[in-house]
């Protein structure tokens, strides 16, 4: 593994598991106000269904991922698609989502805080928040070219699931208050 390029960004599905557990257990996701995608270093896109409940056991999650990468699809017992794997670059994923704004979250971003980043995300009708799921390092150039503003929400490097928890909580608070920069009360959807 260490001989592969960008080896520090490989081999840590536990980070993705923690991040997904955090995002998929939020009221935003449960109320279908959050869409979640995973983009891999090997240019694979994982689309997550609105009703997915991720296994809490890492070992069950690992088996699920093996099945997904083998079959390109995970279905429920009723036949509903829960996860779908396809080929695509990060730019392809942005084209699929079609957000008005793509916000990166990185320890090397412009210093801010979770509340201000959430307010910025809420200022657009359809925002995407991008959090790196690797042990160390930063976004590749292929990713940064598709990002809009990139922020750091702490003066120390935070783990991906902590960043997700803080940002999504701030988004929930704004939605509960009905804050809308244009004065209307329309529901917003955030992609992560």
Task: Annotate the PLM regions.
Residues 1-109, 172-180, 191:
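RNA substrate-binding interface of SAM-dependent RNA methyltransferases
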Residues 102, 129, 150-152:
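Short, well-ordered beta-strand core segments
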Residues 106-115, 119-138:
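Long, charge-patterned amphipathic alpha-helical coiled-coil/hairpin "stalk" segments used as oligomerization
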Residues 49-56, 117-119, 142-143:
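Short, aromatic/basic amphipathic alpha-helical patches
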Residues 57, 89, 113, 139-140, ...:
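Helix N-cap and loop-to-helix transition residues
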Residues 135-192:
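Structured adenosyl-cofactor binding patch, chiefly the S-adenosyl-L-methionine
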Residues 95-96, 123, 143:
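Structural alpha-helical scaffold elements that stabilize or flank donor/cofactor-binding regions
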């Amino acid at each position: 593994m260490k001989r592969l390029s960008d080896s520090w960004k490989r081999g840590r599905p536990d980070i993705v598991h923690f991040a997904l557990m955090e995002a998929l257990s939020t009221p935003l996701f449960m109320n279908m106000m959050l869409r979640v995608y995973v983009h891999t270093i090997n240019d694979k896109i994982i689309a997550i269904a609105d009703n997915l409940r991720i296994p809490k056991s890492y070992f069950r999650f690992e088996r699920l991922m093996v099945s997904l990468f083998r079959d390109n699809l995970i279905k429920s017992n009723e036949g509903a698609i829960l996860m779908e794997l396809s080929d695509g670059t990060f730019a392809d994923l942005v084209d699929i989502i079609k957000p008005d704004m793509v916000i990166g979250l990185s320890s090397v971003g412009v210093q801010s805080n979770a509340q201000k980043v959430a307010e910025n995300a809420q200022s657009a009708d359809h925002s995407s928040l991008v959090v790196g799921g690797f042990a160390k390092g930063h976004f590749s150039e292929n990713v940064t070219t598709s990002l809009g503003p990139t922020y750091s929400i702490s003066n120390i490097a935070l783990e991906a699931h902590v960043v997700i928890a803080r940002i999504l909580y701030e988004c929930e608070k704004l939605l509960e208050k009905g804050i809308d920069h244009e004065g209307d009360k329309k529901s917003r959807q955030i992609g992560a």
